Amino acid sequence: MPTPTAHKDAQAFNDSPRNVRTYSDLDLFFAAKSVSKDISKVTDIQAVKRSVRNLVLLNHYEKPFHPEIGSGVRGILFEPMTPITAHVLARKIEEVIENFEPRARLVGVRAQPNLDRNEYEVTVEFYVINPPTELVDLTVMLERLR
């Protein structure tokens, strides 16, 4: 009888109720807790949503010591609004999330152009890894600024 592979062993460990991780990040509004006066934090789904949003809005060379991290969507916003441009925008967002956000399992990205307001409505659908959750939707409005 063959022995289980390492992937199956790791998957069984990840599905175990003993392996529950809590993802946390700093609250970027820097709101102080009323009792301890510490900076509050965001956890789990909210932390991953904030990280995905930051990755979408981050340009290359904006993160110190990591010039490779960034989506580069600002350059696309100045291109003519066509279905091809919307597809390229969605593809760049998919790439940055798949490469730099290990806490999210991406389901899909939709970029819908709003020609009247010169903006894109980008919807990112993903699951938060460990603990598995329901489908998370993140909608970001992208518009060009001069």
What do the predicted segments below correspond to?
Residues 1-91, 95, 107, 112-146:
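Immediate N-terminus of the mature polypeptide
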